A protein has these predicted regions:
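Conserved AdoMet/S-adenosylmethionine-binding subsite of the radical SAM
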Residues: 89-210
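Intrinsically disordered, low-complexity peptide-like regions
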Residues: 2-3, 141
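Conserved Radical SAM active-site core
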Residues: 3-4, 12, 16-23, 35-38, ...
């Protein structure tokens, strides 16, 4: 396949830069504790300094993979898929979610919301970042708002973002892993005073699973 053909297939969402895929237990937010197949796509320009998967940022370092091959692996393992990154909405998600739907797979996405929403989703976890704010139209679509808390200023940012989502959207505060011992007491106290929020933990890291 020549580079022009490959680029055309990537632009159409028929090839995606696959960093990794694995079957595991979801560790964060509303669906924590439930089994799901994860698809981690390469490519992200949001640039969070505390990102724990910076190797995902450069999409060119990850193989362009057919969505048919990706979905085939999903079908063998689970009836629920979580597409994450990187920032998956850098790519057209419509073809892969169509194929997943045709195979009765529930579709979840984890996104910063910095790019236009594409694809057909059962669950949208929106995790806004200060470096590159979400586009306005995605807020009303979010089922879950997950705010990563690195310092006290992030609580102000979280409150501001919570005003933009629908009243049915679930609200979570999650400590940034490297600062968890410092910020967890702050988050716990904040949630007790502001019970519209819930605490999210990266339980997969405590369990030492992917």
């Amino acid at each position: 396949m020549n580079l022009n053909n490959q680029k055309e297939l990537i632009d159409k969402g028929l090839l995606l830069p696959l960093m990794e895929s694995f079957y595991t237990i979801q560790g964060e937010g509303y669906h924590k504790g439930s089994a799901a197949f994860f698809i981690r796509l390469g490519g992200c320009d949001v640039g969070c300094h505390w990102c724990d998967v910076k190797e995902s940022w450069d999409s060119k370092t990850h193989p362009s993979t057919s969505i048919n091959d990706i979905v085939s692996d999903v079908i063998k393992n689970s009836d629920t898929v979580v597409i994450t990154g990187g920032e998956p909405l850098m790519w057209d998600m419509s073809p892969i979610t169509k194929l997943l739907r045709e195979n009765n797979i529930r579709t979840h996405i984890e996104t910063s919301g910095a790019y236009k929403l594409s694809g057909d989703w059962d669950w949208i976890c929106l995790s806004p970042k200060k470096n590159k704010n979400p586009i306005n139209k995605i807020y009303s679509k979010a089922d879950e708002l997950k705010m990563v808390i690195y310092n006290l200023d992030d609580l102000k940012f979280a409150e501001n973002e919570s005003k933009k989502v629908s009243s049915s959207c679930l609200l979570y505060l999650q400590p940034e892993w490297s600062k968890r011992e410092k910020v967890m007491p702050i988050i716990v106290d904040y949630v007790m005073k502001n019970p519209k929020w819930k605490v999210s933990l990266q339980t997969h890291k405590y369990l030492n699973i992917p």
